[in-house]
From Swiss-Prot:
Location in the cell: Recycling endosome; Golgi apparatus, trans-Golgi network
Lineage of producing organism: Eukaryota, Metazoa, Chordata, Craniata, Vertebrata
Superkingdom, taxonomy of origin: Eukaryota
UniProt GO cellular component terms: recycling endosome; trans-Golgi network
Ranges for region Disordered: 1-73, 159-180, 195-225, 370-393
The name this protein goes by in its record: RAB11-binding protein RELCH homolog
Basic and acidic residues bias spans: 195-219
Gene: relch
Presence of the UniProt keyword Coiled coil in the record: yes
Length: 1196
């Protein structure tokens, strides 16, 4: 069992026992407990020492480092030895000798009890000493020596090299440790008491209570070492050893359960326990080596002054009183040594004063040269060393501190006997309440605040970004200063005084929280120390701890770490950021936990403003590119994209433009939607801003994306890759705000745009809602006020002065728009997704560039292409452009961007003209259908579309009326039932009585769609009556096209229609049509009807059909259809035969199951009764196995 750490005992001072007889007076080996009692000190000396120990007790109790150093006062050894030898000879020299009895001349010699106790302890006669202590305690004459010895549990935890009586020639090399008391050196009382699983670490009940007094056990239980909670490192190490032991002994299930209960630890790697932590032997080896366990000696040990055994006379020799001459000689030696001490102290004071003067000169020079990158961390030591003079103890050796760079912590380790300088500073800062202004710090203040340390300069990019765009770009940095801890992190100090104040504010929060996984509380301390520490190796270690502080940091914890990194960078400058922070990022770029890689990706963007410009465009860009290409986690790549956007706001090397473009294409093609979204929100706008400055937006970026779309259309003649088309087109759409900003910034009126007088207001709906602040035109320009002035001049210029000399706008009008319209004409109109994407693009383009631009520049170019006039109608081939995607994109993307009355009239007129021209030219209606489908998704256009269709219903041409009837089928699905009842059904009823049979036939699909979607019974009855008239009116008996259309409609809507409509109307009429088709004499018509009937029956076979309908209509209809297929299509006849057989089996199964159903009811009742009786009998049994077995015996 490990001994208590030096310096951590209750006393806090160091003590020890001099080993071996042959040694000289001097330093004793390492002590296992700082509160050990030196049996060679007198009572008065112990009291002095104890007083000093009490002053240091609180500080030493909290010390967790096992490497504390306790240097001792350099007091001449002879002084202490002579004082002890004079105890009985001259009581006048040492009046405070405690309970010793001075010998008077002529009296027989009497041994002092204190000397007896010292001898017993030295000879390890502990039981005798304990008995003596008990008797003295009962008589009221307690010896401090025995009291202190037995109250210190550390004296009973030392391993023994040999039992008492063996190896009596113990030397100083053994450390002078006391041997273990045999009564408690047992396994159960020692190791289980300290290393039990009990969270309170209380002493095991199996300690030999009869051999240890009650007070000793109480002291032992209340020892700080026992009550100290287990450290995280200790817990992980023990968990690992326990799991390893379980696996070696094939306790795999127990190991799995143990691993699940400790899921925060990786049991496969020892390195997960702790960095640079050596792995101990397994549990079995530790148990076997328990008897040989000894306290591990430390590199720097506690030191005490002792006396060689040879200098102590045996008890019998004490009776021999030394002669007076010898006493006077010893007194002279003591006086001489004391004079030397006084001289040394005087010399030390002079040197300290000289050191103080030199340090003040150094501090003044450092203030003058504050532009240096590394803050000087040498603490002033003059006050600290001067306080040593007044507080040093007589029992220790004087230690001269010559290292002017010693840290306050290091001094505390070397000088435990003096009050540390840090403690009073922290104590004072605790009395000062934190400023309430710290809680009001916001992220914008943190981002825009200049460096708080004079002389720190950062590379400013040679860019022309507006401050608003710059601020919006930096808003994506993952920082937070809106909380107490965020304020602490962002306000790190740059001087020793500031560090001390920070410690005073943060320590009260760290102490209660650090054991509850609140490790982010440590970030201010780590950062302050890393900022001010003079040694680069120590700074690297601290930053490594910062990045590894939390195993898997969540979003809030990452924000705290990144906020601290930015504050650190603002204080130390770009050189140290490059040398110290970036290597930490590089180390974790391939970490197994995505949260760590996410921290790296976010830090690259947050640190971008504080890095040298060469590093931004080389190392950091390469790191982010590697993570974008290789990382498999979507959230990591998303953070990479945002950091790339921030980097793009600071790169000013034109050679990196092409690399940025390749990264942009890679990001746009990422399979993760969140990565693509981050690209449109951050990366693309930031890259576009750089492209604008380089003048490449209109010369390279947009033309390149357009050429890729054209290439895609050429390669996709047999199948368009809609995903890539969406990727490039969405990128163009995100570039529209940047393109408009370029047009405004390069306009002829730019010099006139000055903020004077009242600034005009921008309409709320003037621009489409941006998906990101970086796509807001006002942000790109600089402010809404500046944009308002530019817009006013822009509209005036377009309306009155034109575009002469306006190169950027002329490029849009003369190159961009014609190329886009040409691309639109090559889009397949049946590709709904492509039509929708281009419609959104033109809608945003027109809304961004304004109504005047749309009316004067965009619409004329479309109208020139479409040429909507009756003289252009070609009845043989039709108008080719009207059948392309140009029609729906113009209608839904351009004509709908403004919703005033005149705009709606223009849209209605355009759709009416298209419907008329397509109908009269017998052209396909796909373009018109695409327009209706796209507009029908918005309920605001339903009335408008019904107006267009009513125009077709009352048109003089039967072709137009027929087209209107077919368009109703598309509109019914999205229109509410009120409009269907008021507008759609009356129009269809009108068309169903049209003189032209083709018009009447065209209404059938629309009636069928109503039956499929509407739930109002009145409407359904009206539709049912109209369809019945088509089927039963003799004038339609020979209308082959009508019959075909009705059968096709039944097959489409039958499975989704109301069951009553399907059972009462659809199936009986299909049976009738199948029977009539058997008498058809024309084979072509007979086969056409039969084919449509086969498709309708195949669709309806999946529906539930009652037995009556199956027998009366479904099966007879299938048999009639099989008769047709036997003669006309044998391949269909095989399928029909299997369908008929399957239906017949279903009917037979239902017939057979009916009588079985009544029997099954009776059987279920019997089984329930049997089950009840069985359970009742089972409940009457006891747990006897024999009685339970009797239940299942056969009756005889």
């Amino acid at each position: 069992m490990a001994a208590p750490a030096a310096g951590s005992g209750p006393g806090g001072s160091s003590g020890g026992i001099t080993g071996g007889a042959g040694g000289s007076l001097g330093v004793v080996g390492p002590s296992t407990s700082t509160s050990s009692v030196n049996p060679f000190l007198s009572d008065s000396e112990e009291e002095e020492d104890g007083g000093e120990e009490e002053e240091e007790e609180e500080e030493d109790d909290n010390e967790e480092d096992d490497e504390d150093v306790s240097p001792l006062n350099e007091r001449p050894a002879a002084s202490l030895a002579s004082r002890y030898l004079q105890d009985e000879a001259d009581s006048t020299l040492l009046p405070s000798a405690g309970p010793r009895l001075c010998l008077q001349p002529g009296e027989p010699g009497r041994v002092p009890l204190d000397a007896v106790a010292a001898q017993l302890l030295r000879d390890q006669l502990l039981l005798t000493a304990l008995e003596l202590h008990t008797e003295l305690l009962e008589s009221g004459r307690e010896l401090p020596r025995l009291r202190d010895y037995f109250s210190n549990p550390g004296n009973f935890e030392r391993a023994t090299a040999a039992p008492p009586g063996f190896g009596g020639n113990t030397t100083a090399s053994t450390g002078g440790q006391l041997n273990r008391a045999g009564s408690i050196s047992t396994l159960d009382s020692l190791d289980f008491a300290r290393y039990s699983d009990d969270g309170n670490r209380e002493t095991d009940e199996r300690v030999a209570e009869n051999e240890v007094p009650l007070q000793e056990r109480k002291n032992y239980k209340s020892s700080p070492e026992i009550q100290e909670p287990i450290k995280p490192l200790e817990k992980r190490a023990l968990n690992f050893l326990v799991n390893e032991y379980l696996l070696k002994n094939n306790n795999k299930l127990t190991s799995i359960t143990f691993s699940d209960e400790n899921d925060d630890q990786d049991f496969e790697l020892w390195d997960d326990v702790g960095l640079n932590t050596p792995k101990p032997p397994d549990l079995l080896q530790l148990y076997r080596n328990l008897s040989n366990h000894q306290t591990v000696s430390k590199d720097v040990a506690d030191i005490a002054v002792g006396v060689i055994e040879g200098d102590l006379e045996p008890i019998q020799a004490v009776k021999q009183i030394a002669p007076d001459s010898h006493i006077s000689q010893q007194a002279a030696i003591i006086k001489e040594l004391e004079d030397k001490i006084i001289l040394c102290n005087n010399e030390k004071a002079a040197l300290l004063e000289q050191i103080g003067n030199l340090e003040r000169q150094i501090e003044s020079l450092q203030k003058e040269n504050s532009a240096s990158g590394v803050c000087s961390a040498a603490p002033p030591t003059s006050d600290r060393l001067q306080s040593q003079t007044s507080e040093e103890s007589d029992h220790y050796i004087d230690i001269q501190i010559t290292d002017s760079d010693a840290k306050c912590e290091g001094t505390e380790e070397r000088l435990p006997f003096q009050q540390s300088e840090c403690e009073p500073v922290c104590q004072v800062s605790e009395d000062i309440p934190p400023s309430p202004e710290l809680a009001k710090i916001r992220k914008t203040t943190l981002l825009s605040a200049p460096p708080s340390k004079a002389g720190v300069h950062f590379d400013k990019p040679n860019r022309k970004l507006s401050p608003a765009f710059h601020q919006a770009l930096l808003s994506f940095c993952r920082m937070s200063a809106d909380s107490r801890l965020g304020s602490e992190v962002s306000q790190i100090a740059d001087s020793e005084n500031g560090v001390m104040k920070m410690l005073g504010r943060c320590l009260p929060h760290i102490v209660p929280n650090v054991l509850l996984a609140k490790r982010e509380e440590l970030i201010p301390l780590i950062l302050c120390t890393a900022c001010l520490h003079p040694e680069s190796k120590e700074r690297d270690q601290l930053l490594h701890i910062l990045f590894n502080l939390i195993k898997r940091p969540d979003d809030e914890q990452r924000q705290m770490i990144l906020t601290g990194c930015v504050a650190f960078a603002r204080h130390v400058g770009p050189t140290r950021v490059e040398a110290e922070l970036l290597p930490q990022c590089w180390e974790q770029i391939n970490h197994k936990y995505p949260e760590r890689r996410l921290l790296v990706a976010e830090s690259c963007g947050d640190l971008a403003p504080y890095l040298p410009k060469e590093i931004r465009s080389s190392l950091v860009l390469a790191m982010l590119q590697q993570m974008l290409m290789e990382d498999k986690a979507d959230m990591v790549r998303e953070a990479v994209i945002k950091s790339l956007g921030i980097i793009m706001g600071y790169i000013d090397d034109p050679d990196k433009y092409s690399q940025g473009f390749e990264l942009l294409l890679t990001a746009l093609g990422d399979p993760s939607e969140r990565v693509v979204s981050a690209t449109h929100q951050v990366f693309l706008p930031a890259y576009a801003a750089w492209t604008m400055e380089l003048g490449n937006l209109q010369s390279h970026l947009i033309p390149t994306l357009l050429s890729k779309i054209e290439k895609l259309l050429k390669e996709g003649e047999h199948g368009l890759d809609e995903h890539k088309l969406h990727m490039y087109l969405s990128a163009l759409q995100s570039l529209i705000p940047s393109l408009f900003a370029t047009v405004l910034q390069n306009a002829p009126f730019t010099s006139k745009a000055k903020l004077q007088g009242e600034v005009p207001q921008i309409e709320v709906t003037r621009f489409p809602r941006p998906v990101s602040p970086l796509q807001d035109v006002a942000t790109i320009i600089g402010s809404r006020e500046q944009l308002a002035v530019l817009l006013q001049l822009y509209d005036y210029q377009l309306e009155h002065e034109g575009t002469t000399g306006w190169e950027s706008l002329l490029w849009v009008v003369n190159q961009l728009l014609p190329q886009l319209i040409e691309i639109v004409g090559r889009i397949t109109v049946t590709s709904t997704a492509s039509v929708h994407e281009f419609s959104r693009f033109f809608w945003r383009l027109c809304r961004t560039f304004g109504k005047i631009f749309t009316n004067t520049k965009v619409k004329p170019q479309f109208q020139e292409i479409l040429r909507l006039s009756e003289e252009n109608i070609d009845s043989t081939a039709g108008n080719g452009v009207l059948t392309k995607a140009t029609v729906p994109i113009y209608a839904t993307g351009v004509l709908t961007c403004y919703n005033q009355e005149e705009d709606r009239k223009l849209l209605v007129g355009f759709l009416e003209d298209v419907m008329t021209m397509l109908s009269l030219s017998h052209a396909p209606l796909d373009s018109l259908k695409a327009s209706f489908v796209e507009l029908g998704t918005n309920p605001a256009y339903h009335e408008l579309l019904l107006t267009v269709l009513w125009y077709g219903v009352v048109h003089t041409s039967a072709l137009v009326r027929c087209t209107a009837a077919r368009m109703f089928e598309l509109l019914v699905k999205g229109v509410n039932e009120t409009l269907v009842a008021q507008r759609v059904v009356p129009a269809l009823i009108t068309l169903s009585s049209d003189p032209e049979i083709s018009v009447r036939i065209a209404t059938v699909p629309a009636f069928g769609t109503i039956m499929e979607t509407v739930t109002q019974r009145e409407l359904l009855e009206r539709v049912k009556m109209q369809l019945a008239s088509f089927l039963e009116d003799p004038q339609y008996q020979d209308q082959h096209s009508l019959q075909t259309e009705i059968i096709r409609t039944f097959g489409r809507v039958g499975p989704n229609a109301e069951p009553r409509f399907r059972d009462d109307f659809v199936l009986p009429h299909l049976h009738k049509l199948s029977f009539v088709n058997n008498q058809q004499s024309v084979d072509s018509k007979r086969l056409d009807i039969a084919t449509h009937l086969f498709e309708a029956y195949s669709a309806l076979s999946c529906c539930f059909i009652s037995e009556e309908l199956m027998m009366n209509h479904f099966l007879p209809g299938l048999r009639c259809l099989r008769t047709d297929m036997e003669q006309l299509s044998p391949e269909h006849e095989v399928i029909l035969s299997s369908m008929i057989k399957e239906c017949e089996q279903k009917v037979e199964n239902k017939t057979v199951q009916e009588p079985q159903g009544s029997m099954s009811i009776a059987a279920s009742l019997v089984s329930e009764d049997t089950k009840t009786k069985f359970l009742n009998k089972m409940g009457q049994l006891t747990t006897s196995g024999a009685m339970l077995a009797n239940v299942f015996q056969r009756k005889k």
